[in-house]
Regions:
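One face of beta-strands
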Residues: 24, 37-41, 86, 99-103, ...
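Bacterial N-terminal signal peptides
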Residues: 5-16
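Beta-strand/loop substructures that line and gate deep hydrophobic ligand-binding cavities in soluble
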Residues: 117-164, 168
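Hydrophobic ligand-binding cavity/cleft-lining segments
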Residues: 19-79
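Beta-strand elements of well-folded, non-transmembrane domains
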Residues: 45-49, 59, 88-92, 107-109, ...
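Glycine-rich portal/gate segments that line the openings of hydrophobic small-molecule binding cavities
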Residues: 32, 44, 73-121, 171-192
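Solvent-exposed, polar/charged alpha-helical surfaces in well-ordered, non-transmembrane soluble domains
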Residues: 50, 54-60, 159, 164-167, ...
Length: 193
């Protein structure tokens, strides 16, 4: 590799901060496809697969994890299929986007979570979360979602808006995963909530 390429890479790293150059915990990409936005994210939390799973499916306590949620509860449970109702306000710059969602959640414990919007302020939303074993006792989370908005403003700023929201939400989720993992390590007899 030439010195010139190394210098350019170093300048990019310095201008974006060290997190861009050293294994980021949350990486998000958003693209447009017709009337929808496709979100893909890779999350590398430094926690066990079990802790990651417990946080991802803790819908009844999600308001304590995600600051943009004002309500989150499981309204129906049938084995590994849940109906979850959530409300909140997403903020992006000077804009805010109040939302409501009722979603069907299908879980394959410790492996996969499928979500589909049944009703709410989004025109359409479907997502898949996959937990993939990584390293010794670690986990990598792959997230893919498709969003279609009813709001013109949300649609206009969709790529930037979703990139901001998804990255912020997964950073909060990773912080909760770390908190619970540390709590479990310090006192294995206490529940992780």
């Amino acid at each position: 590799m030439s010195v010139r390429i190394l210098l350019v890479a170093l300048l990019i790293c310095l201008s974006h901060g060290s997190a861009s150059c050293v294994g980021r915990e949350v990486a998000v990409a958003v693209s447009e496809s017709g009337d929808a936005f496709i979100v893909q994210a890779t999350i590398r939390p430094p926690v066990s697969p079990r802790t990651a799973w417990e946080v991802l499916v803790d819908f009844d306590h999600m308001t304590g994890i995600l600051s943009n949620l004002t309500a989150s509860r499981v309204v129906s449970r049938n084995g590994n299929v849940l109906i979850v109702r959530q409300e909140g306000i997403a903020r992006f710059g000077i804009f805010s986007y109040p939302f409501k969602a009722e979603r069907e959640i299908r879980m394959e414990p410790q492996r996969r979570i499928l979500a589909k919007n049944l009703s709410g302020t989004l025109k359409r939303m479907e997502s898949e979360v996959r937990l993939i074993p990584s390293g010794v006792g670690g986990v990598r989370i792959e997230y893919r979602a498709e969003f279609a908005f009813d709001s013109i403003i949300a649609g206009l700023f969709g790529v930037s808006f979703l990139n901001h929201e998804v990255e912020e939400q997964f950073q909060s989720i990773v912080a909760e995963m770390k908190r619970r993992e540390a709590q479990a390590a310090s006192d294995p007899l206490q529940p992780n909530r």
